[in-house]
Amino acid sequence: MLKQRELHECHVLYNLMTDPAVFPYVRYPCQSYEEYLFITKQLIVEEEQGTCISRTILDEIGHPIGTIDLYHIHHQTGFLATWIGAPYFGKGYNQRAKEAFLAELFLGHDIETIFLKIRTQNIRSKKAVEKLPYVTLANERYEQVYQSINHSQQRYNLYCVERSDFLESIGGIQHEVAT
């Protein structure tokens, strides 16, 4: 479901990203394929430097359908950014991608807290993240971070995933599956 980013996937991902239902909500809204290719190269370099972790989201047959990134990694925290192409909306990919990525981050990297900033008008993302049992609204708990993401005219809600909450949640999920 997730794999490291590769440049040969950029054509498919760029075409999915430019859909009007997706484009306003991506972290890097590129205006051209060449710009998207450049940004992807930068992300690969940043991952090598340890400042971000970026993955391609795949469907069941291995086609790229979106991306998921942890960026601004600092003091065991980072920000999560995810987008999925419109043809794949409502099919459970978002939740599965997040769970796989969070498991990788919390079990394979030294990450304790993951922040998600969601534009107040992005109802689709808000509903999707609030379905996840390990995500909490963090506007008050992390007020300084909340203030820092709301310094422009664009308004965001801040959510977070703590390592302990996620691991407890997936332990419960795994127990339910086993019984």
Regions found by a protein language model. Name each.
Residues L43-T56, G66:
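A short helix-loop-beta-strand connector motif used in the catalytic cores of GNAT acetyltransferases and
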Residues P29-C30, C52, V145:
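Sparse recognition of residues in long alpha-helices and their boundaries
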Residues H8, M17, E35-F38, C52:
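Generic alpha-helix structural propensity
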Residues Q42-L43, E104:
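A generic secondary-structure signal
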Residues M1-H11, N15-A21, L58-T179:
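Acyl-donor (CoA/ACP) binding surface of acyl/acetyltransferases
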Residues P24, Y33-E35, E47, S148, ...:
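A short hydrophobic/aromatic micro-motif that marks alpha-helical segments and, especially, helix-coil
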Residues A21-Q42:
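Conserved GNAT-fold acetyl-CoA-binding loop/helix
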